[in-house]
A protein has these predicted regions:
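Absolute protein N-terminus
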Residues: 1-2, 93
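Active-site-flanking beta-strand signature of metal-NTP-handling nucleotidyl enzymes
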Residues: 3-8
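Short, surface-exposed ligand-recognition loops at beta-strand->loop->(often short) alpha-helix junctions
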Residues: 9-18
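An amphipathic, aromatic/His-enriched active-site/gating alpha helix that lines ligand/cofactor pockets
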Residues: 24-38, 54-89
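Short beta-strand micro-motifs enriched in acidic
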Residues: 42-46
């Protein structure tokens, strides 16, 4: 399995819009990507503009399917303060 942690900072005051966009996209992922085992958004308790998307994929093919779907989606609202930082991990346990 492959785990991904994406860190994204919302522009000040744009957190609710970022959450709504992620929520809508997560529904698409749930319906169209059976190899995506987990796809959640988490907000920092210390910094309300800092978010972590935690993703778990069955295999590399599932990651590639997700990336293709993500690149094909219409642009979301302009709510991020910059590009996400992406950490890709091999799940051990």
């Amino acid at each position: 399995m492959i785990a991904v942690i994406a860190t994204v900072r919302a522009k000040p005051g744009k957190g609710p819009e970022l959450e709504a966009d992620f929520r809508a996209w997560a529904e698409v992922v749930k319906q169209k990507e059976p190899g995506t085992l987990q796809y959640t958004l988490n907000r920092s308790k210390e910094d309300p503009d800092l978010y972590y998307a935690i993703e778990l994929y069955q295999d590399e093919a599932a990651v590639q399917t997700h990336m293709a779907n993500f690149q094909a989606r219409p642009p979301g609202p302009d709510v991020a303060a910059g590009p996400p930082q992406i950490l890709v991990l091999d799940r051990v346990v």
